[in-house]
Design a protein with these regions (language model features):
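Post-transcriptional modification and biogenesis factors for structured RNAs
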Residues: 1-277
Length: 277
């Protein structure tokens, strides 16, 4: 087993480059790190270019035997703890990461889904990752993100998704208003959160809706608000006026899930339960 001992190794330097968005975009690759997400990548049949393993961590037997059996089938690179420390973004690394080639997924919006989630300027990687995880938990297969939303393949985003990133088609919109208008032409209505409304998130039927989640500081952009069909707010019992973007997204997505399972919406619409296969 050959072990890389130098941080100046060309392969190690190429991995370090993937910490920057411009190189992730140029090479169409990104990094995942940690035992669980590497296992998820294998399970989801992600295109793993190679796995990097810290020699010392392997000697400590912290890896599951079944995982090591699967990893052994891949292109594995072994490095010293010093070299691994130079490429990790985690304060307490588990000693394993992988370089993933981005899947060649369609950038066309699928209008067959009940609900489309759109992100309008989400900046925090943790929020973006949590929203992707929530979208996956609702069995939604796509998300549309504006140009000014954080990079979905940022390492913090990827960690926050807990593997959901392998199951969701992330569609980057170069012209969000144009894409939203096309969604309306395909029978969808646009729902945004706003403070200047008396309508609650619990008052509407979520079938064939586009749920737009806005920027953490400024909310949904004015241009998007102007073409919205429904403005809603999340009822607050305390003095707080707004919620974290990922929390707000979770509340709205799970109101859709509740209705999907046979609940009644505030407008009186009753949904027959439709269980996803």
């Amino acid at each position: 087993m050959q072990v890389i001992t130098s941080k100046d190794n060309e392969l190690i330097k190429s991995i370090k480059k993937l910490k920057e968005k411009k190189y992730r975009d140029a090479y169409n690759k990104y990094i995942i790190e940690g035992i669980k997400i590497v296992g998820e990548a294998i399970q989801e049949k992600a295109d793993i270019e190679y796995v990097v393993i810290c020699e010392d961590c392997m000697n400590e037997n912290i890896f599951d035997k079944k995982l090591m059996y699967e990893i052994a089938k891949l292109n594995c690179i072994y490095v010293t703890s010093k070299v691994f420390a130079s490429i990790t973004d985690v304060s307490n690394p588990q000693g394993i990461l992988a370089v993933i080639k981005r899947a060649e997924k369609s950038q066309k919006i699928n209008y067959k889904e009940d609900v489309i989630i759109v992100l309008d300027g989400i900046q925090d990687p943790g929020n973006l990752g949590t929203i992707l995880r929530t979208v996956d938990s609702a069995n939604l297969k796509q998300i549309v993100i504006s140009n000014d939303t954080a990079d979905a393949f940022n390492s913090k985003v990827v960690r926050s998704t807990m593997g959901a990133i392998f199951r969701i088609n992330i569609i980057k919109s170069d012209d969000l208003i144009k894409d939203l208008i096309n969604m309306k032409k395909n029978g969808f209505k646009i729902v945004v959160t706003a403070l200047d409304t008396n309508d609650s998130v619990y008052d509407i039927d979520y079938m064939k809706k586009v749920i737009v989640i806005g920027n953490e500081a400024n909310g949904v952009s004015q241009e998007v608000q102007e073409i919205a069909d429904n403005k809603v707010k999340i009822p607050m019992l305390g003095k707080t006026e707004s919620l974290n973007a990922s929390v707000a997204a979770g509340i709205m997505i799970y109101e859709y899930v509740r209705l999907k399972l046979g609940g009644v919406s505030g407008d009186g619409a009753f949904w027959q339960p439709i269980f996803c296969q």
